[in-house]
C-alpha cells in the first residue's frame, strides 16, 4: 500500500547570534506565525519592539529563498513556522562599589523562519 502526500514546498532562513533575549523575540514571532508574508511585513513595520528589525531581515531572506530556489510567488507565501532558540550569552562585568564587580549577561538568540506556499482553498 502506497500513500502519497502532497506537501507544500518549504523555504527557510536562519538568523544566528542575534542580540536580544529569546522571550522578547518570541513575543513578536507569536504574532506573525501563520500569517501571509504581506500581512507579517505590515505588522512588523508598525510593532514598537526592537526585535522586529532582525526578524524582518530573516523573513525577507526566507521569502528570497522561496522565490529563488523554489520559484514560488511571494504573494502566495504563508509563515508556516517561526521559532527562536537561546544562543550563547556574552559575559561582561560592571564595576561596583568597594572593588566589587557584577556580571552582566548580554543574551543572544537564533531565529528560524519557514515559509510555505498557501494551500489552495
Curated annotation (Swiss-Prot):
Superkingdom as given in the UniProt entry: Bacteria
A GO MF label: rRNA binding
SS bond list: none
Cross-referenced PROSITE patterns: RIBOSOMAL_L22
UniProt keywords, alphabetically: Ribonucleoprotein, Ribosomal protein, RNA-binding, rRNA-binding
One GO cellular component, as annotated: cytosolic large ribosomal subunit
UniProt GO BP: translation
InterPro entries membership: Ribosomal_uL22, Ribosomal_uL22_bac/chlpt-type, Ribosomal_uL22_bac/org-type, Ribosomal_uL22_CS, Ribosomal_uL22_sf
Quaternary structure (record): Part of the 50S ribosomal subunit.
Family classification: Belongs to the universal ribosomal protein uL22 family.
NCBIfam families in the cross-refs: rplV_bact
Function as written in the Swiss-Prot or TrEMBL entry: This protein binds specifically to 23S rRNA; its binding is stimulated by other ribosomal proteins, e.g. L4, L17, and L20. It is important during the early stages of 50S assembly. It makes multiple contacts with different domains of the 23S rRNA in the assembled 50S subunit and ribosome.
Identification of the protein by name: Large ribosomal subunit protein uL22
Taxonomic source organism: Parasynechococcus marenigrum (strain WH8102)
Amino acid at each position: 500500500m502506497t500513500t502519497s502526500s502532497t506537501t507544500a514546498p518549504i523555504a527557510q532562513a536562519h538568523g544566528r547570534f542575534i542580540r536580544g533575549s529569546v522571550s522578547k523575540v518570541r513575543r513578536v514571532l507569536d504574532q506573525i506565525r501563520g500569517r501571509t508574508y504581506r500581512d507579517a511585513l505590515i505588522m512588523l513595520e508598525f510593532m514598537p519592539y526592537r526585535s522586529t528589525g532582525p526578524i524582518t531581515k530573516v523573513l525577507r531572506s526566507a521569502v528570497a529563498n522561496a522565490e529563488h530556489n523554489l520559484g514560488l510567488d511571494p504573494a502566495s507565501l504563508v509563515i508556516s513556522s517561526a521559532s527562536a532558540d537561546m544562543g550563547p550569552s556574552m559575559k561582561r562585568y560592571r564595576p561596583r562599589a568597594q572593588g566589587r564587580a557584577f556580571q552582566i549577561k548580554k543574551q543572544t538568540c537564533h531565529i528560524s523562519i519557514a515559509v510555505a506556499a498557501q494551500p489552495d482553498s
